């Protein structure tokens, strides 16, 4: 090849890359311009340990060796982000066959070893956050992979959520119950979970179902977080009374911990162009100061007093990476990213055996938080303001 033809090829390649950047949503274009990640070793490591050949995702950290609708739905999202079609299909098929997902009922939330030693559904109640992630993964798989059968399944599941897990809650408007059963706390009183409502998912659902409750629910989600976090720290659970507003859940817990850490995660991965991103982050600004003061996210907050307790595990540090990036906390971002990276390298070099004894710091839940938080920071996926996801493989295509 002559120097002239080599130069011409490079110019053509650069022009093609620039054209692709211009076709991508803003955040995705920025990620592409900075260089797409070549692979996703954290997903591959998780899949080797936790995703069985039949699509069952196992949490080895509990005696039940359970699989949950959360694990299955999160796994489908990560498989989509990794362009892992075979695992996506297997995870969905296992979920349909064993949890009931995609049938005429919502999926059971817990499957595993039952009393007596047999395996099967332990709790048939559903978990609405997982139901949303199932629907979202299916809708986006249909769009990105051009597979209309996933669109049909996603819309069917979304309709079931509307029918069984959404309630009109006075001035709060339509709101998502954590599940169909067990969350009515009295007349016009409900127990809610602020971490169940990622804004990008609600935006995407509003796009495919504009007559549905999703746009109003996004406004309600902002109220849920801001009005239930008086000290700027989100609770795991909160009571909403249609006559009195939000009240601490003194019966269950006033703490913000393993559920609530996802509130900061979702606020961080929300596109800056979403009009609710700014108010949401402003309401939770004390978390940024707490991370700087304690060298990382505390494990727990008393959300009434604001008092912290303990140091969060590595998954918490990974979960707040998008939050720290979005809020411009450069020093804390660098420190927490280094912590996650160092712990990951140490853990992966040890090549621990699969199972509860070998999970170590990167057990099921810490791994899930790491895939979401560190994966986002790596550029493995981005949401735009309409809730559509752009995975890294799309900008490499």
Language model: regions and residue ranges:
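N-terminal secretory signal peptides and thylakoid transit peptides that target proteins
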Residues: 1-19
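Low-complexity, Ser/Thr/Pro/Gly-enriched N-terminal "stalk/linker" regions
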Residues: 22, 32-70, 80-115, 119-121, ...
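Extended ligand-binding clefts on enzyme/binding-domain cores
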Residues: 34-41, 65-69, 104, 108, ...
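Aromatic-rich carbohydrate-recognition surfaces in CAZymes
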Residues: 68, 72, 121-143
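Short glycine/serine- and small hydrophobic-enriched flexible loop segments
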Residues: 76-81, 133-143, 200-204, 265-269, ...
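Active-site-adjacent structural elements in enzyme catalytic domains
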Residues: 90-97, 139, 152-162
């Amino acid at each position: 090849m002559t120097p002239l033809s080599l130069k011409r090829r490079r110019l053509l390649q650069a022009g093609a890359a620039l054209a692709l950047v211009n076709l991508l949503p803003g955040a995705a274009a920025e990620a592409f311009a900075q260089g797409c990640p070549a692979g996703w070793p954290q997903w591959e490591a998780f899949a080797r340990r936790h995703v069985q050949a039949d699509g069952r995702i196992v949490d080895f950290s509990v005696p039940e060796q359970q699989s949950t609708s959360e694990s299955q739905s999160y796994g489908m999202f990560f498989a989509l982000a990794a362009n892992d079609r075979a695992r996506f299909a297997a995870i969905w098929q296992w979920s349909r066959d064993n949890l009931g997902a995609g049938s005429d009922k919502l999926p059971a939330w817990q499957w595993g070893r039952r009393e007596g030693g047999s395996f099967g559904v332990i709790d048939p109640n559903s978990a609405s956050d997982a139901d949303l992630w199932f629907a979202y993964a299916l809708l986006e798989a249909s769009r990105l992979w051009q597979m209309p059968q996933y669109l049909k399944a996603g819309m069917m599941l979304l309709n079931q959520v509307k029918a069984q897990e959404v309630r009109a809650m006075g001035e709060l408007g339509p709101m998502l119950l954590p599940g169909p059963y067990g969350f009515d706390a009295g007349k016009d009183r409900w127990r809610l979970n602020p971490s169940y409502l990622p804004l990008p998912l609600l935006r995407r659902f509003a796009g495919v179902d504009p007559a549905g409750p999703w746009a109003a629910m996004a406004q309600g989600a902002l109220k849920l977080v801001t009005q239930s976090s008086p000290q700027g720290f989100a609770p795991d659970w909160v009571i909403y009374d249609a006559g009195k507003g939000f009240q601490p859940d003194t019966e269950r817990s006033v703490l913000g911990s393993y559920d609530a850490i996802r509130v900061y995660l979702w606020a961080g991965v929300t596109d800056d162009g979403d009009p609710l991103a700014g108010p949401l982050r402003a309401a939770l600004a004390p978390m940024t100061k707490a991370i700087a003061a304690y060298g990382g996210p505390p494990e727990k907050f008393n959300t009434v007093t604001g008092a912290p307790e303990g140091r969060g595990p590595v998954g918490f540090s990974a979960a707040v990476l998008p939050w720290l990036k979005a809020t411009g906390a450069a020093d804390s971002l660098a420190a927490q990213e280094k912590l996650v990276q160092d712990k990951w390298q140490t853990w992966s070099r040890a090549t621990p055996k699969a199972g509860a004894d070998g999970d170590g710091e990167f057990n099921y839940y810490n791994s899930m938080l790491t895939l979401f938080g560190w994966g986002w920071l790596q550029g493995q996926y981005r949401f735009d303001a309409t809730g559509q996801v752009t995975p890294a493989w799309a900008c490499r295509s």
